[in-house]
A protein has these predicted regions:
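Conserved, well-ordered core segments of regulatory domains
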Residues: 1-17, 21, 88, 97-102, ...
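RNase H-like nuclease fold core
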Residues: 1-77, 82, 86, 91-94, ...
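General alpha-helical segment detector with a strong preference for membrane-spanning helices
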Residues: 16, 83-84, 107, 190, ...
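Conserved beta-strand -> loop -> alpha-helix junction used to position metal-binding or nucleic-acid-contacting
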Residues: 48, 75-82, 87-125
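Short, charged, low-complexity patches
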Residues: 55-58, 113, 117, 206, ...
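Hydrophobic/aromatic-lined pockets within catalytic cores
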Residues: 66, 70, 89-93, 109, ...
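Acidic/histidine-rich catalytic cores and adjacent linkers
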Residues: 129-251
């Protein structure tokens, strides 16, 4: 069973290729990593499914977390995979949902010219260092106004999701960088990428993939994740106070 209370859950999907009957097929690894009230990270779910990333598989992952005992989460951090935001909100209605800022910055390079993208990045860095949500909201609106003519459709989408790009500003300063991206999941993805390259660019079977996932998870949980990062250690009392305040009010 899982701890019923978590400060944060980071979710992300990673594509890999598996060899099956002399053919390569795509699979998606659905990862969920929790940050406990003790400040330690733990892998909650790591499931490989054939085919492309899809909402039904994400529903299965989130439902599985609840079935295993998870009840209260303060903040979910995820990318803006189409349709995932309302699903996360439906399963955990009292959690903030933060959309990954790294994915946002990458998208700017797709939607804006090189010059505009550079300015977008500069303005976003200023938002990330905002004192509080109110200042961040104002700067975010100014950013959307600035690029409304260059990319009206995308700016419209950003405005609708403003609270989900700025949720990290509600939390202690030492945690804002961690809470604004899904980079925590990259600790596992990075190890898998090395294993993939060393295996010739793909995994030789589903069993091989599961075995190597287990190795990657164990090396983190038994290694560097055993010691609290400095930012987490300094912010932990405040994070737990925020957790207690929020969920006492929602009982």
């Amino acid at each position: 069973p899982l701890d019923p209370d978590l400060l944060a859950v980071f979710v992300d999907g990673k594509y890999v290729e598996l060899r099956e009957a002399d053919k390569l097929r795509s699979a998606c690894i659905y990862l969920a990593i929790g940050l406990g009230r003790d400040g330690k990270k733990r892998v909650l779910s790591c499931i490989a499914r054939p085919g492309r990333e899809n909402l039904e598989d994400w529903k299965s992952v989130l439902r599985g977390l609840i079935e295993r005992g998870l009840r209260r989460v303060m903040i979910f951090i995820q990318d803006d995979f189409s349709g995932l935001l309302p699903i996360s909100q439906s399963f955990f209605p009292n959690a903030d949902v933060q959309l990954c800022a790294v994915h946002l910055q990458r998208n700017a390079k797709t939607h804006l010219s090189k010059t505009d993208s550079a300015e977008f990045q500069q303005r976003w860095r200023a938002i990330k260092s905002s004192w509080d949500v109110e200042v961040g909201n104002r700067q975010f609106e100014e950013l959307c106004d600035r690029f409304a003519k260059a990319s009206p459709s995308w700016m419209g989408e950003l405005r609708k999701k403003r609270q989900h790009y700025l949720a990290f500003l509600k939390y202690p300063e030492p945690m804002r960088k961690s809470f604004s991206t899904t980079n925590v999941v990259e600790a596992i993805n990075g190890q898998l990428e090395i294993m993939r390259r060393n295996s010739g660019g793909y995994f030789h079977s589903e069993q091989t993939l599961k075995f190597k996932l287990g190795l990657a998870i164990s090396s983190l949980e038994d290694g560097r994740w055993r010691t609290l990062a400095r930012g987490i250690a300094s912010a932990l009392p405040q994070l737990n106070a925020l957790f207690q305040s929020r969920f006492e009010q929602t009982r």
